Amino acid sequence: MEKIVVYTDGGCSGNPGPGGWACVVIDGDDARELSGGSRSTTNNQMELTAAINALSVIYNTPRFKSRKIEVNIDSQYVKNGITSWISKWKVNGWKTASKKPVVNQELWQQLDKLNSALDVEWKWVKGHAGVEYNEICDSLCQKQINLFK
């Protein structure tokens, strides 16, 4: 069975400011684009929201749930958070190493729930480097940001 390939992106005009998120969920030759935005948000919130929406589509599509998933993301914050930092945050009661509450905790908890229920491999891709689906996500993000300006 082919794996599901995902690309995500999130961004803001100002931080905080109007923001957008986008994802592309690819199953063989079928690519599904999703996007949304918010009038007042942060870059990191939009990056997390993109990943949550992508994994939600997969989780809620029965034929996808048992498949391997490759998430390509240009956010080191999300990639490192979900693959490394989150296990320590949970052990520490959602506190960072410096004993401060984890920023965007609710979003991290949503992402963790989906990530734990699926077979996900997280890969970092360089943003604005000509990676086709990453560029599509970036363009969709910009359209969403412009709706809220």
Where are these regions (language model features)?
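RNase H-like nuclease fold core
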Residues: M1-Q45, S56-Y59, D138-K143, L147-K149
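RNase H catalytic domain
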Residues: G11-N15, I52-I136, L140, Q144-L147
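Short, conserved alpha-helix that lines the donor NDP-sugar binding/gating region
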Residues: E47, A51
